[in-house]
Structures are given as C-alpha cells and as structure tokens.
C-alpha cells in the first residue's frame, strides 16, 4: 500500500501525541463491546480503527478470547507498541481507503477517533463498507455540549476539547494539544450517523478522566443525560 504523508499525519506520528487509550477508556470500550457480542453466535471479527498502542484492544481481546481482533492505525510507533503486545495490527488510514475488504467485520470500533479527522464522512463510509449487513459501529467522542462547556462558552471561553491550532492551546482550559478538528453534540452525531446509513441503537454518556477531582461526582452525575455528558458513546447498526 502506498503511503502518502501530510501535516496531520506527521502530527499524529510525533512524539508528543498520546498513544495510549488510558485505563478508563479501555474498560469502557471493553464493556460496550461485550454487550454487543452477547448477541453474536459465532466468533466475530472486530476492527479497531485508530487503535493507538493497542492498550484498549488488548483489554478487549483478553475479555473476549473467542473473537478475532485487528487494529488499524497510521502511527508507526503506535503499531510497534501494539505488535509488542501480540496484537494483530495493520498500518493504514480511513482516508482514502482502509486496507480491508468489503463486509468482513462484525464490529467496527471508532473510539475517540472521529474528532481527529478532516473528513468524517469518508471515515464513516469506510466503516460502513467494511461492516457486514447489520454489523455494529461502536463510536465514542468528546461532547461539544458537555455541561461545563455550556458555561465556558457563555463566559466567552473556548470549550474544552476544541482546538484552534496544532501549535499550542489557546483560549481554553488544559495544556495538551490533541489534534481535535471536529466536535459533535448528541443531536449532531446521531443525525450524522443516520444520514451515513446507520441506525443508532443506544446513546449513553461517560465521564472525562481529566475533569478536576472536586468536580468528578458532578461529571459522573451528568452521565445520566448523554446530551450534557463529557463523552458520547454510540452503538449504531449498519442499515
């Protein structure tokens, strides 16, 4: 497969970009996946797009040993780490095309990937292409309308998760540049997925690991209302 680099791919291959999903995200992803796989009769094929260093994929693989897993990422460093964990991984990108045949996957995972993409339409179309009919998409992404972002924006402060530059953080809390390009509210995300040929089965909320500790209980409470939660979790099926 020919590999073409561009500035964003160089950014995500850089040494300062986090490669690990973190324990909270890994456990959350494994729980979502386990719930979906309960309805699958035989061994399923699961693709993790933007798998990073494979930390979340390793947890899911351990908890679901009878199923087949593969991760796809652009970062060579991330893939080396994932391979060292004994995982099946491929180097590739959701644009223009994944290195996977049509209709091979029972489940596609896009865990906090879509917010990093220039062309989410193409990415979700690729996820749909590689899914079998009725296959599941498990997608998570930061919520633009998280409870604290509503107050920040009203005060004239750039919302958490949003970024105006890859060079530094400007006008919002936090210090890490994550490369977020697209942010969604619950309504925008479900509308987008429906227009992309998916039926949204469930939408739930999750907490954000970087919320200051005193605000942790409040962040957990808002998980009951996904439209105001920190993280949006969607299970959608290919129509």
Please place each PLM-identified region on the residue numbering.
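Conserved SAM-binding loop
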Residues: 33-151, 185-186, 190, 233-238
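A short, well-structured juxtamembrane/interface segment
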Residues: 25-35
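S-adenosyl-L-methionine-dependent methyltransferase catalytic module, highlighting the catalytic core
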Residues: 4-27, 55, 118-126, 130, ...
């Amino acid at each position: 497969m020919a590999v073409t680099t561009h500035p964003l791919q160089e950014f995500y291959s850089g040494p300062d970009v986090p490669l690990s999903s973190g324990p909270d995200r890994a456990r959350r992803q494994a729980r979502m996946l386990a719930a979906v796989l309960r309805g699958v009769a035989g061994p399923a094929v699961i693709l993790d797009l933007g798998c990073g260093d494979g930390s979340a994929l390793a947890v899911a693989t351990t908890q679901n040993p009878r199923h087949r897993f593969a991760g796809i990422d652009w970062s060579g460093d991330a893939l080396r780490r994932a391979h060292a964990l004994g995982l099946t991984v491929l180097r590739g990108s959701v644009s223009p095309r994944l290195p996977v045949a049509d209709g091979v996957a029972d489940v596609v995972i896009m865990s906090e990937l879509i917010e990093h993409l220039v062309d989410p339409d193409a990415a979700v179309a690729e996820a749909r292409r590689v899914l079998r009919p009725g296959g599941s998409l498990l997608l998570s992404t930061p919520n633009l309308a998280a409870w604290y972002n509503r107050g920040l924006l009203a005060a004239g402060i750039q919302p958490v998760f949003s970024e105006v530059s890859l060079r530094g953080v400007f006008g919002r809390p936090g210090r890490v540049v994550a490369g977020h390009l697209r942010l969604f509210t619950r309504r925008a995300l479900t509308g987008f997925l429906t227009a992309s040929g998916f039926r949204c089965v469930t939408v739930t909320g999750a907490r954000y690991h970087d919320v200051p500790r005193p605000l942790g209980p409040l962040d957990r409470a808002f998980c009951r209302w996904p439209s105001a939660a920190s993280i949006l979790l969607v299970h959608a099926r290919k129509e």
